């Protein structure tokens, strides 16, 4: 499946084969975010100048120190709770586990508030799945600039959205 790096594709396939394809979109989301965001054990400033650590964690609780892997995973799980809650609360149409995964990584990056007001959500709730997916490609700006890294990320999210099952991941 074009657009998904081999390492991420292998991780998604492993979760799918383990039975995560039906109800385990959370683990696919974790794996996707680890790939898309990477893990930074030391705080840094992202492309928009926001202090960030671990797997895209931001906020006033960041300390200028080295974080452990376990701390990073705990922060990621905590950061994902409002994302999953937003999907459950705002999305009114059925989604495949892969669509939920793509949507969760998108919301993690753009924020729940932005998603809740987006054309993407309006299209999705109107049943326009392709139109909703295509809206992801518009979200490629940070700090007023178009970023290649965000374009690449959206390409991956859109490709995950299109996965139908394990056979797609084996290609």
From Swiss-Prot:
Keyword match DNA repair: no
Keywords, sorted A to Z: Antimicrobial, Bacteriolytic enzyme, Cytolysis, Glycosidase, Host cell inner membrane, Host cell lysis by virus, Host cell membrane, Host membrane, Hydrolase, Membrane, Signal-anchor, Transmembrane, Transmembrane helix, Viral release from host cell
Residues the record marks as active site: 37 (proton donor/acceptor), 46 (proton donor/acceptor)
Main localization of the protein described in the UniProt heading: host cell
Entry GO CC: host cell plasma membrane; membrane
Gene3D superfamilies attached to this UniProt entry: 1.10.530.40
Compartments reported by the entry: Host cell inner membrane
Induction of its expression: Expressed in the intermediate phase of the viral replicative cycle.
GO BP field: cell wall macromolecule catabolic process; defense response to bacterium; peptidoglycan catabolic process; viral release from host cell by cytolysis
GO molecular function, one term: lysozyme activity
Recorded consequence of changing residue 37 to A: Complete loss of enzymatic activity
EC number: 3.2.1.17
UniProt cross-references to Pfam families, sorted A to Z: Phage_lysozyme
Catalytic activity: Hydrolysis of (1->4)-beta-linkages between N-acetylmuramic acid and N-acetyl-D-glucosamine residues in a peptidoglycan and between N-acetyl-D-glucosamine residues in chitodextrins
Transmembrane stretches, start-end: 1-24
Membrane topology according to the record: Single-pass type II membrane protein
HAMAP family assigned to the protein according to its UniProt record, in alphabetical order: ENDOLYSIN_T4, SAR_ENDOLYSIN
UniProt comment concerning the protein's domains: The signal-anchor, which may also be an uncleaved signal sequence tethers the SAR-endolysin to the membrane until the latter is depolarized by the holin, resulting in the escape of SAR-endolysin from the membrane.
UniProt function note: Signal-arrest-release (SAR) endolysin with lysozyme activity that degrades host peptidoglycans and participates with the releasin and spanin proteins in the sequential events which lead to programmed host cell lysis releasing the mature viral particles. The SAR-endolysin is released by the releasin protein into the periplasm, where it breaks down the peptidoglycan layer.
Family listed: Belongs to the glycosyl hydrolase 24 family.
Protein name: SAR-endolysin
